[in-house]
Amino acid sequence: MTEEENLDMLLSLFAESEGQDLESPAAEEGEDNLDDLFDEDDDGEQYIEPEEAEEEKEEEEEEVSPGKSSSSDLNKSKEDLEAELKLMQEKMQKLQQQLEASQKTTPAQNKPAVQRQSTKSLTSPQAGVKTTPPTVRDSDGSPSNITAKLKNKQRTAHQPKAASSERQIPIGQSTNQPQPMRDGAKVNSMLKSPPLIKTPPTVRQPTPRLPVNQEVAVEKFSGLRLRKPRLSSIDIEQKMASRKLIRLSQLPDRLARDNLEDSDWVTFAVIINKITPQSKNNGKTFSIWKLNDLHNLEVNVSLFLFGSVHTDLWKTDTGTVIGILNPNPMKNKEGSNELSLTVDHPQKVLIIGEAMDFGTCKAKKKNGDSCTQLVNLYECQFCQYHVKAQYKKMSSKRAELQSSFTGSAPGKGRGRGSLKERLCQSDFHYGGMSSLACAPSMSAPQPKKQPTIQSALASIPTKKLVLNSGQVSGCSDDFRGLMSMPTPGALNIKRHLGQSKSSAVAGSSVQSVSASDLLKQQKEQHQQRMMARKKRAEEIQKRVLQSGGAPVASSRPNVSRGPLLSPKAASEGPKGSGSSLSGPAVPTLGRGFSEGEDIVFDMSPPSSKSLSATKLAAVRKLQAKGSVIVKEDPNAVKRKRANSGDITGRVERNIVKAKVTDENSASEEEEPAMKKRREQLEYIQSEEFQRILNAKSSNSWMMGEIEERAMQEYFEPLVQKEKMEEKMKSIREMKCRAVTCKTCKYTHFKPADRCVEEKHDYHWHDAVKRFFKCPCGQRKICLARMPHGACSHCGLFKWERDGMLKEKKGPKIGGELLMPRGEEQPKFLNSLK
């Protein structure tokens, strides 16, 4: 059954090859030989991956022989084909015999892997396309030659070019070395037509992608960075060898100035917009492309596609870089100055690749929508209308990028508000009138502030007021429960009530005394205190002498024994007055002392007669023994005589120490410093030390990536800021809206209030604003070709064109600051004439 299927498959393949051979001469006769077009050999119509380019070259070399033999195959007769079929049948029988023999010897575990690999190789995308068998004109019918042919035929996984239909694509492939086939089922799978489902090939390894930060080369002729290039730089140079390049932004001027009909010229552009295909009166469809070269974003060109050009190219995506060969200019519409071009053949348009720098502005409009202005992402990410605002926004973030700015407002770290907040706390008086410090705020109303403690306490009626008013009705249970809890509010109320009670009592004991009476009272109190102090000291001395072993109270009182009493209480202590002072509970000098205790402030040194208990006990013991202590003379010179034994021991120790030092010095002389240094160098140069020195962590690459990422995050904003500066420096003029008042005869960016109020004859129109600068540094923006007046700073009329951003000048060197003639005075010396 398998042999019949194989024969049917071979017959169908031969029939298809005959049909293709019959169609190929007609196709070759119908081809046009266009010498002045880009793609004579149909290059560049299909995108080819870099890996597939080499494989395609090998495939083309292998397909040369089948292409040459196509003319000879047409002359074959049916008898020759039948003979070839018989030959193929014999070969298939031999192959089947070899498969049966190899199936017995092959281990079972190798079958799934080989079968999986062969099935994957047959499910490539090219399998779904029309296939043709290899030519079978070899005299050698060995299986090795057939497997070699099958192996050499399968090389690529991409789809064949649509235009080159005469190319033949093999049906089978094998990634291993030529060897006998192992399974009959595998032969059937190779001879059967594969399914049409496109699956990616698994034999080829994935293409290594470029890193993100790797620079992409700029194409020579278009000046743009390309993504997925269709042609190599060498092919583009060959096509541009005898042709002249004209920039798209310069094309309107060149067409108006020069005659380009006789020359062979090319322009490159990017498709920035595609208008929906439209129909003409005769029913034919055409399309319009908007083109720009991304170097001058103000110059756009329209390309009209008619007939076959529209049929072949209308699916081209936006952002594609194309080259146009000798386009024909068209007449402009009435009131339109935009240049329009057209081409008469599809091969006059060369698709190069995709523009990597094609994009739109990333800023937002005032209404919140995204900006749709065209930008070159390599130069700047913002259009000329938003770049200045973004530059100011990025410049305001300098503190966040290059300092330790925390984001908190200054002056609020210690509870201080801003100057406005501090001024707005109260009114101010000026000129005899009172006014608010600040105007009322237009912001949302602030929440109501909580009442302060003073206001809450003032609202609580005191006990005295309630008693006087006769409104005491008792305390409620809820209030009593709240007051019993140790909350801050309850404690504050209790403290307030206690202070009011004490202040009332203290106020009733105040008496008026004259100055002389007050001095007399103070003098009497002082004398009483001194007398009480002396009596107290005498009593203490008597107690000490009577109780010999008992501890003696010091003449200076111990402050830590209790709270102190007032001087008045101390003076009344010896008199035996037991009544306590009645007065306000205010801090006193003797706080903490009990009633009747004394405080002695006698700072005089103690008398020599008074001895401590320990000294008295020692004196009594000496008297009992009968010994007497002789008093030493303090003026006598004391000298302690050393013991002879100590001296001899010290001498022996010094001798032993000297011997040890001599031995050490001798050993040091034997090993000089050079020898030690040599040993150290030998250790440093040893393998062990070098291995320790060169040892690194296995995760050191992670630190490198982190540092690189940190550097990129730091420098990326600076690079973007520099790009914005360069873009603003390059902008010399901008389109804008202006107003012209015919009554007042002026043109400005907005109308004056007087013109609006009096309803003058003014109208809005499109204008161009230009930037100028004076040698003195003054800048001016003007809507005319040149400013009408002189410089307001220096009085000169020497205006020069300048960019949107003022040029930043660095520090000047000494030669620039040197003025040999001194400071110039043009108004007096006329030095500028």
Swiss-Prot record:
Region (OB-fold domain): 202-360
Pfam family, one: zf-CCCH_Mcm10
Example GO BP: DNA damage response
Keywords from the UniProt entry: Coiled coil, DNA damage, DNA replication, DNA-binding, Metal-binding, Nucleus, Zinc, Zinc-finger
Matches recorded under InterPro entries: Mcm10, MCM10_OB, NA-bd_OB-fold, Rep_factor_Mcm10_C, Znf_Mcm10/DnaG, Znf_Mcm10_C
Chief localization: nucleus
Basic and acidic residues bias spans: 75-93
UniProt superkingdom: Eukaryota
Record field: compositional bias (Low complexity): 502-516, 571-583
Biased composition (Polar residues): 115-126, 165-179
Region of interest called Zinc finger-like 2, as start-end residue ranges on this chain: 741-760
Keyword Metal-binding in annotation: yes
UniProt region (Disordered), positions on chain: 18-208, 502-589
Segments for region (N-terminal domain): 1-122
Protein family per UniProt: Belongs to the MCM10 family.
Function: Acts as a replication initiation factor that brings together the MCM2-7 helicase and the DNA polymerase alpha/primase complex in order to initiate DNA replication. Additionally, plays a role in preventing DNA damage during replication.
Protein name: Protein MCM10 homolog
Gene name of the encoded protein: mcm10
